[in-house]
Amino acid sequence: MATKTFSLPFLLIVCIFSQLSSTFGDPSVKDLGQHAGYFSLPRSKSARLFHFFFQSRNNSSDPVVIWLSGGPGCSSSNQRYISYLKISNLIYVDQPIRTGFSYANDSTDLRHDEDSVSNDLYDFLQAFFKEHPNLAKDDFYITGESYAGHYIPALASRVHNGNEKKEGIVINLKVTDISLVTATATWSAG
């Protein structure tokens, strides 16, 4: 496993900048509503999906959007669609397992098809909305790029089926068609 090392001068500069930023009233990471972390998956032995979550800069009741990247195996966390934050709460997920910072210690947790990936993402969303219950009632959109065109309809179907069967927290899914998902990604981001 590769580790990153930083020089002492670099770390001092970061600490000084952080202190100056808070001294002069610049927003902190907490103020900006940014969260990152892992959720474990109940259908796995040891898998953890990593995510970044950015709260809307406009209104906490703005829609929740999950951004999926393609590849397969491309991390969603390298995307920087800041304009989305003006109109939505945005989730990036490193998926499938062993992409980006997501990991598993058991090879049986690796996924090789859209159904398995969509089950993992559904479990992720259940954990996410359990941690953020105030967002569960908000409109929910699935979007992405490239190979995510395979995952988007699979996840939309999984969410729809989970809602119908009352398997957990009801997710207020607003898009169930891949063509509509593509259109959603281009709605006015101001």
Curated annotation (Swiss-Prot):
The record's Gene Ontology cellular component field reads: extracellular region
InterPro entries from the UniProt entry: AB_hydrolase_fold (IPR029058), Peptidase_S10 (IPR001563), Ser_caboxypep_ser_AS (IPR018202)
Which superkingdom? Eukaryota
| GO MF annotation, one | serine-type carboxypeptidase activity
Record-level GO BP terms: proteolysis
Signal peptide segment: 1-25
* Record's subcellular location: Secreted
Q: Which residues are glycosylated?
A: 58-59, 105
Keyword line: Glycoprotein, Secreted, Signal
Where is this protein primarily located? secreted
Q: Does the keyword Signal apply?
A: yes
- Say which family it is in: Belongs to the peptidase S10 family.
Q: What is this protein called?
A: Putative serine carboxypeptidase-like 54
